[in-house]
Swiss-Prot record:
<dbReference type="InterPro" id="IPR020929">
    <property type="entry name" value="Ribosomal_uL5_CS"/>
</dbReference>
<dbReference type="Pfam" id="PF00673">
    <property type="entry name" value="Ribosomal_L5_C"/>
</dbReference>
<dbReference type="InterPro" id="IPR031309">
    <property type="entry name" value="Ribosomal_uL5_C"/>
</dbReference>
<dbReference type="GO" id="GO:0003735">
    <property type="term" value="F:structural constituent of ribosome"/>
</dbReference>
<dbReference type="GO" id="GO:0005840">
    <property type="term" value="C:ribosome"/>
</dbReference>
<dbReference type="GO" id="GO:1990904">
    <property type="term" value="C:ribonucleoprotein complex"/>
</dbReference>
<keyword id="KW-0699">rRNA-binding</keyword>
<keyword id="KW-0694">RNA-binding</keyword>
<dbReference type="GO" id="GO:0006412">
    <property type="term" value="P:translation"/>
</dbReference>
<dbReference type="GO" id="GO:0000049">
    <property type="term" value="F:tRNA binding"/>
</dbReference>
<keyword id="KW-0820">tRNA-binding</keyword>
<dbReference type="Pfam" id="PF00281">
    <property type="entry name" value="Ribosomal_L5"/>
</dbReference>
<keyword id="KW-0689">Ribosomal protein</keyword>
<comment type="subunit">
    <text>Part of the 50S ribosomal subunit; part of the 5S rRNA/L5/L18/L25 subcomplex. Contacts the 5S rRNA and the P site tRNA. Forms a bridge to the 30S subunit in the 70S ribosome.</text>
</comment>
<dbReference type="InterPro" id="IPR002132">
    <property type="entry name" value="Ribosomal_uL5"/>
</dbReference>
<protein>
    <recommendedName>
        <fullName>Large ribosomal subunit protein uL5</fullName>
    </recommendedName>
</protein>
<dbReference type="InterPro" id="IPR031310">
    <property type="entry name" value="Ribosomal_uL5_N"/>
</dbReference>
Amino acid sequence: MARLKSLYNEELKQQIKEELGLANVMQVPKITKITLNMGVGGASQDKKLLEGAVADMTAIAGQKPVVTKARKSVAGFKIREEWPIGCKVTLRGEQMYEFLDRLIAIAIPRIRDFRGFSPKAFDGRGNYSLGIKEQIVFPEVDFDKIDRIRGMDVTITTSAQSDEEGRALLKAFGFPFK
């Protein structure tokens, strides 16, 4: 079992229940999924860029990403409908907790000039989104083998009903907020 999953089940559930003043342990919010998204701007001109992004995302997530395609044509961006423009992967269960553990313990401390995540990035329903500017903060990505520095979006979806519950959950996991 993943380290953070057992920690959540054995200690954090009770701690969050008391902190939020909930009556039942089943009301305690939990993380339902983590979605990683990488938009590849030049993928419409150069298909190799997308292959590099897929390789990086596979190494980071431990799961092959799905290629996202443009929903409609936009002349200003020089893209057409159905053209590949990025990749995304959704993590659930054990892989989700393993990724969250690596994100908190290894990747976040390697971010340059990091002062904590903004507490304002909650969406009103307890879900949190953050951006990572460089994929090289993850140790799985070999610095010598990358073709270019890419960023990614990480969305942590929780079962929380409010931002306050979501913040309490992520803080219990050790998320560094400002």
